[in-house]
Amino acid sequence: MSSAPAQGPAPASLTLWDEEDFQGRRCRLLSDCANIGERGGLRRVRSVKVENGAWVAFEYPDFQGQQFILEKGDYPRWSAWSGSAGHHSDQLLSFRPVLCANHSDSRVTLFEGENFQGCKFELNDDYPSLPSMGWASKDVGSLKVSSGAWVAYQYPGYRGYQYVLERDHHSGEFRNYSEFGTQAHTGQLQSIRRVQH
């Protein structure tokens, strides 16, 4: 009796449209795209369909500005990717796949101070409210992603600015809040969850 060869996960892919509700011109991505205007010919992205994998979208070219996690599914307009974020962004201009998301084996350690100093707490599950689980501060000074990929949020309930934190970026070591993302002006993180791949 022979068995089928083991198959890895399907390659990451998503389709972008320049109008809401999957209308207008479209472009399909299978890898990083630093500027959708140059590579895909779209001036803006107003709706997204993620076929495989998880992606990080950025509001500006060259992976700059606010980050938005895009997991498998449909995003017919900006409110679908912004969620309950206090930040309105109706444009996405650069994209990259999240390559290290493994929901079953994700681990991150939060530190109160910069450079992995002070009180610490290790997580391997989703936390809609870090203060409710005993994290005394509204800020996280630094963190280490041991495995997987995480999305941290500015406020409880997975609201506010999003920061995608991966083992494969910065070797999983984020020494201070400015390394969380280009839009990080504070270390305020109050909820965190594993990226769904």
UniProtKB/Swiss-Prot annotation:
Keyword Hydrolase part of the UniProt annotation: no
Gene3D superfamilies reported for this sequence: Crystallins
Sequence ranges assigned to domain Beta/gamma crystallin 'Greek key' in this UniProt record: 12-52, 53-99, 106-147, 148-196
Secretion signal, residue range per the UniProt entry: none
GO molecular function: structural constituent of eye lens
Keywords assigned by UniProt, alphabetized: Eye lens protein, Repeat
InterPro entries, A to Z: Beta/Gamma-Crystallin, Beta/gamma_crystallin, G_crystallin-like
Sequence segments annotated as region (N-terminal arm): 1-11
SMART domains, alphabetized: XTALbg
Keyword Ribonucleoprotein (UniProt): no
Pfam families named in the record: Crystall (PF00030)
GO biological process: lens development in camera-type eye; visual perception
Region spans: Connecting peptide: 100-105
SUPFAM superfamilies registered for this protein in UniProt: gamma-Crystallin-like
Subunit comment: Homo/heterodimer, or complexes of higher-order. The structure of beta-crystallin oligomers seems to be stabilized through interactions between the N-terminal arms.
Entry text on domains: Has a two-domain beta-structure, folded into four very similar Greek key motifs.
Function (record text): Crystallins are the dominant structural components of the vertebrate eye lens.
Record-stated family: Belongs to the beta/gamma-crystallin family.
Name of protein: Beta-crystallin A2
UniProt organism field: Bos taurus (Bovine)
Gene: CRYBA2
